[in-house]
Regions:
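Arg/Lys-rich, alpha-helical DNA-contact motif
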Residues: 2-19, 25, 39, 44-45, ...
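DNA-binding alpha-helical recognition surfaces that contact promoter or target DNA
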Residues: 36
Length: 112
C-alpha cells in the first residue's frame, strides 16, 4: 500500500476503516446494536484478516439513521425495514427521473 493509496482511502466512504468498538463509540451506541442491525441485514460489515467486523463511513451513516429511529421508539427490525424501503424508494425515484429525461430527450429529437 502506497502513501497515495492510504490518503485516497481517507476519502473513500466505502472503505471499512472502523472497528466495531470505534463505530459504536462514534455513534454513541453499543456493539450489540451494531450486531442487531447486522443480523437484520441492514448493513454487512466486512471482516478483517483476524475475523473482526470493520465498518465504512457509509455503513455508519446507515447505522446512525437506524439509531435515530430506535431512539424514537421504533423496534430494531422495523427500523431496518424502514431504512431499506427508504433506500429502495430513493433508487426508484432516481431511475424514474433518468427515464423521464431520456423520454423527453427522445421526444425533442423526434420533433426536430
Amino acid at each position: 500500500v502506497t502513501a497515495d493509496d492510504a490518503y485516497t482511502r481517507l476519502d473513500d466512504d466505502d472503505y471499512p476503516a472502523y472497528t466495531m468498538g470505534r463505530a459504536a463509540e462514534m455513534l454513541g451506541t453499543t456493539q450489540g446494536f451494531l450486531r442487531a442491525i447486522g443480523e437484520a441485514r441492514l448493513i454487512t460489515p466486512l471482516r478483517s484478516a483476524g475475523g473482526h467486523r470493520r465498518y465504512s463511513r457509509y455503513q455508519l451513516r446507515i447505522a446512525a439513521r437506524a439509531r435515530e429511529l430506535v431512539d424514537r421508539g421504533t423496534p430494531v427490525e422495523a427500523a431496518c425495514r424502514i431504512i431499506i424501503l427508504e433506500d429502495q424508494l430513493e433508487e426508484a425515484q432516481r431511475i424514474n427521473a433518468a427515464y423521464r429525461r431520456a423520454t423527453e430527450s427522445a421526444k425533442q429529437t423526434a420533433a426536430a
